[in-house]
A protein has these predicted regions:
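Charged, amphipathic alpha-helical linker segments immediately N-terminal to NTP-binding catalytic cores
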Residues: 1-3
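Conserved helicase motor core of SF1/SF2 NTP-dependent helicases
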Residues: 6-14, 18, 22-132, 136-226
Length: 226
């Protein structure tokens, strides 16, 4: 279990329990699986716990800001208005564990930072708990850029779903460009790095979500056969 100000976050499946253990023991953890398995949510809980214990000085939450064929340039409004729709799920996880005024105060103080992945370029983040969400939508270059931001005393979680690659592709398979797919292939034997896989059996949203994931998996399998 992980204690946060608003609630105690507990593992609901064996795989989630194993994941929490990896998050506590490893400095870099890749977490892969379908939506609703707690990949990012549990990482945020562990990050908040480590922040409260003084094991890190800040939490940095990020995700690529290109999803489902949309680019920031085509969204209305100023930069804050443009990026907030992409970052909303990260705020939702925080608000579930912390009172909203506390989140606002921590954002103001810099102990929590939420930003698009592009804002990470050129930085070195020391004593930070870094979470990259929707990592399947990074390019190889973006993934390398993120992984090399890690400074002394930092920890890193890379979470994604390899069946939901939304990278725009001129031609060919979007999966082949995904930084997550590539990184997991070339980094699988790096000491100190852990890779954790969730399945649809670990979905902890509404019971129908698991059935929906299964139906789409079957549809994709059928289309590949035909």
């Amino acid at each position: 279990a992980v204690h946060t100000p608003r609630k105690t976050v507990t593992a609901r499946t064996v795989a989630q329990r194993s994941y929490l253990d990896l998050l506590r023991r490893h400095e870099v953890v890749f977490s892969v699986g379908p939506a609703g398995t707690g990949k990012t949510y549990l990482a945020v809980a562990v990050g908040l716990s480590m922040l409260r214990q003084g094991r890190v000085k800040r939490i940095v939450l990020t995700r690529p800001a290109v999803e489902a064929g949309e680019r920031l340039g085509f969204l209305p409004g100023d930069m804050a208005e443009k990026i907030n729709p992409y970052l909303r799920p990260l705020y939702d996880a925080l608000y579930d564990m912390l009172p909203q005024p506390k989140v606002a105060a921590m954002l103001e103080a810099g102990s929590i930072e939420i930003a698009p992945l592009a804002f990470m370029r050129g930085r070195t983040l020391n004593e930070a708990f870094m979470i990259l969400d929707e990592a399947q939508n990074t390019t190889r270059e973006q993934m390398k850029m993120f992984l090399t931001r890690m400074g002394l005393g930092s920890r890193m979680v890379v979470a994604g779903d390899m069946t939901q690659v939304d990278l725009p592709m001129p031609s060919g398979d979007a999966r082949s460009r995904s930084g997550l797919v590539h990184a997991m292939h070339i980094l699988k034997n790096v000491p100190g790095l852990a890779i954790h896989h969730f399945t649809k059996a670990d979905v902890v949203r509404h019971p129908l979500v698991g059935a929906i994931v299964t139906a789409y998996d079957h549809a994709n399998t059928d289309s590949e056969k035909s």
